[in-house]
């Protein structure tokens, strides 16, 4: 329904002819007659958008099977969260295959963009000290409650210095969608790495997005490795601290990526779609 509405006002329908007092050529409109299970729409989009017949970029978030199916069909970019590269590579492979084989899309036109939190320092020791300072400001005992709820266990069985009580965690229901995926990620990642509950909580706070700690060079190495090994196409950057996190990202990490030829030095397009490399895609109305 949404895409039909966006395409109901093609660029050539707007004639803006002052001499004839005609702004829109009604004969060129594409009225919508949509009836779905939950929504219905008729007529033409009532707002003249700046896109002029080019639909905005569609972003989909989620990693459940239903999200992968939906996103690979409709989205231009997929937001996701992965702590471990193998799971990221599996997700990447799945959605690219779905796009190509199930929906006959060019998989290069579907971007996979996981979230990441860079914690930067001029030296590795400085970066780790910054991360430790951020961790010290958290009330981990209070955070145990939400983790216990996610895992379906009593908070009393969560000892910060120990691993998760895997024998007490009941299997989650795939029908729970995002909740199921979140629990599976937490449990599988913690078990694979053998980390403590404290470490799980420090990661859980980021919504499952990966934290990369180090110098600009070290973080750039990590990020380019993920892209080069088909774990993602790029990243949705988050800042670790409001007062200077953005400055570290822009002044330290971006120049390092630019020096490696991995980040633009000027914009290629005047649109968000174009700067994602998606010009000429389905966003251009036929």
For each feature predicted by the language model, list its residue ranges.
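Conserved, mostly hydrophobic/aromatic
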Residues: 2, 58, 71, 127, ...
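An alpha-helical appendage that flanks or caps ligand/catalytic pockets
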Residues: 1-53, 86-90, 96-227, 258-286
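A conserved active-site cap/scaffold subdomain adjacent to cofactor or substrate pockets
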Residues: 69-84, 131
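C-terminal structured "cap/appendage" subdomains that terminate the fold
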Residues: 223-268
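Short, well-ordered loop/turn elements at secondary-structure boundaries
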Residues: 52-55, 65, 73-74, 107, ...
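Hydrophobic faces of well-ordered beta-strands that scaffold small-molecule active sites
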Residues: 57-61, 76-80, 110-117, 227, ...
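Flexible loop/turn segments at secondary-structure boundaries
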Residues: 65-69, 85-89, 119-124, 241-247
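Short, acidic/polar
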Residues: 60-73, 215-228
């Amino acid at each position: 329904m949404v895409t039909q509405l966006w395409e109901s006002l093609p660029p050539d329908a707007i004639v803006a002819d002052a001499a004839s007092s005609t702004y829109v050529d009604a004969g060129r409109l594409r009225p919508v007659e949509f009836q779905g299970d939950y929504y219905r729409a008729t007529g033409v989009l009532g707002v003249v958008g700046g896109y002029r017949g080019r639909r905005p970029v569609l972003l989909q978030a989620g990693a459940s099977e239903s999200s992968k199916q939906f996103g690979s069909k409709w989205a231009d970019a997929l937001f996701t969260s992965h702590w471990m590269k193998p799971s990221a590579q599996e997700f990447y492979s799945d959605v690219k295959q779905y796009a190509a084989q199930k929906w006959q899309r060019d998989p290069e036109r579907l971007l996979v963009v996981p979230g990441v939190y860079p914690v930067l320092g001029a030296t590795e020791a400085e970066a780790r000290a910054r991360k430790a300072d951020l961790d010290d400001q958290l009330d981990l005992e209070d955070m145990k409650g939400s983790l216990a709820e996610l895992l379906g266990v009593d908070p009393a069985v969560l000892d910060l210095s120990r691993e998760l009580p895997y024998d007490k965690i009941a299997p989650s229901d795939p029908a729970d969608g995002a909740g199921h995926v979140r629990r599976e990620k937490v449990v599988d990642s913690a078990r694979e790495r053998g980390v403590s509950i404290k470490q799980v909580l420090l990661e859980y706070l980021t919504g499952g997005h990966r934290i990369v700690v180090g110098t600009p060079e070290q973080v750039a190495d990590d990020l380019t490795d993920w892209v080069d090994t088909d774990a993602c196409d790029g990243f949705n950057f988050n800042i670790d601290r409001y007062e200077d996190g953005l400055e570290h990202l822009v002044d330290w990490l971006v120049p390092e990526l630019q020096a490696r030829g991995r980040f633009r030095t000027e914009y290629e397009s005047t649109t968000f779609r174009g700067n994602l490399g998606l010009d000429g895609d389905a966003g251009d109305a036929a």
